[in-house]
Amino acid sequence: MKVTRHGNEMDTVGEAPKVGDIFPTVIAYDEDDQAVTLPKNTGKKLLLSVVPSINTRVCSIETKRFNMEADNFKEVEFITVSDDSKEDQKNWCAAEGVTNLQLLHADKGDFAEVTGLDVPEFGHMARMVFILDETGRVIYEELVTEISSEPDYAKLLNELKK
């Protein structure tokens, strides 16, 4: 897949899951470095936001926005995955007061490769948002082709309301 960062074109390795696909089983890690298998089988929809680094302006804005929106969608689980270390994520969450979503790190393992979001030239994952139904099927996906841009919140939040 093609993405850009400040206009410079780069390629991901592989293809991300598309609408209609069952999301692949992947592992990310929580603040205690415990493996979390995604998608979770909680019987809820899942909004999965993948961001390059939580310590950048756009990733921070996006994650805080989803943390705020989680209050309006109690029937939806919100998870953000980034390439950051657990220490960076803990520090960011403490500073920003983010408590309504789960922040997972994918700085080890094969999350980026399995999801098709690895951008080797960038050294991080591409920015993408997925909404999965209760069975783990992708019902919405948005690859943010300009990595330094935010996703289309109105469009994806409308999808959550369905």
Label the model's feature ranges.
Residues 1-162:
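Chalcogenol-based redox active-site neighborhoods
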